[in-house]
């Protein structure tokens, strides 16, 4: 990722998030975020595939914790409050995927010890597929919603909108495309509500998992 992007765009986005009254996550919070995400992934097809078809709470938690640690310097990671009822992770334009060595040195070895070496292969297979689609639709010139997770007991209380709207307004102001993918059909309608269009729907090759690639064009009327 371009160092200039990290130096300028990421701090600018964080200022917008703070101005909206949201909480910029600190490194000390990453374990709690991983717990929130792992709980939300109990019925998520992709994570079940990562762990050979059966939900594994510890594996999901480790995947998220290692991923968040790896991208801390590059990402905009924020929550609704310090209570962390929900959080979002955005990566700026130029992101092409997590690097293997930082992933391993930030806790990936613990994931291997827990789940076996095969899980790294499945993670790489998915990320390669997902990043190729992102490049196809945005040429990597996008703000990428890597994760949006809400505690189950906090769902339906407007937290998703609280997290999404300031960043989407920022994308509109900057005339930037927003990109995301989901592997659960029920989520497609949620993201359409925020202005995302479904660009591709297909089964990931050699897996039972569906993939939904979505793009949101900047809305000039919001500027």
Predicted regions mapped to residue ranges:
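A short beta-loop-alpha structural element at the N-terminal edge
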Residues: 21-35
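Active-site rim helix/loop that mediates acceptor-substrate recognition in acyltransferases
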Residues: 54-76
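Conserved beta-hairpin
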Residues: 73-90
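Conserved acyl-donor/pantetheine-binding loop and adjacent beta-alpha core of acyl/acetyltransferases
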Residues: 87-149, 205
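Conserved GNAT acetyl-CoA-binding A-motif
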Residues: 141-143, 170-183
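Conserved acetyl-CoA-binding loop-helix of GNAT-fold acetyltransferases
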Residues: 147-150, 156-169
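Conserved active-site alpha-helix within GNAT-family acetyltransferase domains
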Residues: 161, 173-175, 184-201
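C-terminal "cap" of GNAT-fold acetyltransferases
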Residues: 176, 180-185, 204-223
């Amino acid at each position: 990722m371009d160092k200039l992007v990290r130096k300028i765009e990421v701090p600018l986005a964080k200022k917008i998030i703070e101005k909206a009254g949201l909480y910029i996550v600190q490194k000390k919070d990453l374990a709690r975020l991983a717990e929130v995400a792992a709980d939300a992934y109990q019925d998520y097809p992709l994570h079940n595939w990562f762990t050979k078809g059966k939900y594994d709470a510890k594996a999901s938690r480790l995947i998220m914790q290692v991923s968040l640690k790896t991208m801390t310097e590059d990402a905009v990671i924020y929550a609704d409050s310090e209570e962390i009822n929900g959080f979002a992770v955005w990566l700026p334009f130029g992101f092409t995927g997590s690097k293997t060595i930082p992933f391993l040195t930030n806790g990936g070895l613990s994931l291997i010890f827990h789940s076996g070496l095969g899980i790294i292969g499945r993670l790489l297979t998915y990320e390669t597929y997902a990043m190729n689609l992102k490049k196809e639709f945005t040429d990597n010139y996008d703000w990428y919603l890597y994760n949006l997770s809400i505690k189950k007991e906090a769902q339906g209380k407007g937290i998703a909108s609280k997290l999404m709207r300031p960043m989407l307004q920022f994308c509109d102001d900057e005339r930037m495309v927003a990109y995301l993918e989901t592997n659960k059909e029920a989520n497609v309608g949620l993201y359409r509500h925020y202005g995302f269009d479904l660009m591709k729907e297909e089964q990931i090759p050699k897996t039972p998992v569906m993939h939904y690639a979505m793009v949101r064009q900047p809305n000039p009327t919001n500027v």
